[in-house]
Amino acid sequence: DKSLHSVLLNLAKRVAADGEGSSKFISVNVVNAKNFFDAKKVAFSIANSPLVKTAIAGEDPNWGRIVMAIGKADVDIKLNKLAINFGDIKVVEKGQLIPSYEEIEVAEYMRGEKIDLTVDLGIGNKNFTAYTMDLTKKYIEINADYRS
């Protein structure tokens, strides 16, 4: 049912956005995967990567950390088909940093509170989106001192 899906999706986004000490809400969109399971595996590998999350917290457009997380997902990809966008800004195309890449432009985008990462695997038609938050020093302080 679409209504139930909408409510559950809204709740999932709120849970991700509500992380104590977080400063950014992140959508990781994996598109054009060979199958749903590969799309999901890559999306969660990126969304759960401490290196990706800390780079985003530091407003560092470190696309290499995203590529690392894709590789760590252990799914078959074709590097020459890989594309990565930060919001509407294309950073990687055909597995290579685009020639017109301007780090200043991407770093400016990273200052926002909502970050959309899109990873196009270019080998199918299945998509998956994962939601997460950044990993800040404040998050670590809160959770390091937390005791139940």
What is each stretch, according to the model?
Residues 1-57:
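A glycine- and small/hydrophobic-rich beta-loop-beta segment
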